[in-house]
C-alpha cells in the first residue's frame, strides 16, 4: 500500500521534468524582437514591387497585369495535354 504514493510522486516528477524540457527547448529557440521584425518587413516591402501599394510603386501600366503568371498557365496547359485521363489531381 505504501508503494502507490511513491508511484504517484514519480509520475508527477516525470511530468514536471517533461514540462521543464519543453520550456528549455522553447527558451533556446531563436527569437526576434518586434523592432527587428518591423525592420525586416519594411526592408522586404521596399525591395519587392507590390502594386497593391501604389503610393510606393505607382500603378501598373495600362493593359499590364503584374500578377498574371503565364509560366504557371503554360505548365498547366502542357501537363493537361499530356495526360489522357479525365482528371488531374494536384
UniProtKB/Swiss-Prot annotation:
Which residues make up the pro-peptide?
Answer: 88-90
Q: Does the keyword Lipoprotein apply?
A: yes
Q: Lipidation annotated as S-palmitoyl cysteine: which positions?
A: 86
According to its record, what are the GO cellular component terms?
heterotrimeric G-protein complex
Ranges in coiled-coil conformation: none
Q: What InterPro entries is this protein classified in? A: G-protein_gamma-like_dom, GGL_sf, Ste18_fungal
Query: Which residues are listed as membrane-spanning?
Result: none
* Chain positions with Cysteine methyl ester modification: 87
Keyword set for this entry? Lipoprotein, Membrane, Methylation, Palmitate, Prenylation, Transducer
Could you confirm whether the keyword Glycoprotein appears in this record? no
Q: What is its main location?
A: membrane
Q: Where in the cell is it found?
A: Membrane
Instruction: State the disulfide connectivity.
Output: none
GO MF annotations, alphabetized: G-protein beta-subunit binding
**Membrane topology per record:** Peripheral membrane protein
Note the superkingdom of the native organism: Eukaryota
Oligomeric state and interaction partners are given as: G proteins are composed of 3 units, alpha, beta and gamma.
Family, per entry: Belongs to the G protein gamma family.
Its protein name is: Guanine nucleotide-binding protein subunit gamma
Provenance organism: Kluyveromyces lactis (strain ATCC 8585 / CBS 2359 / DSM 70799 / NBRC 1267 / NRRL Y-1140 / WM37) (Yeast)
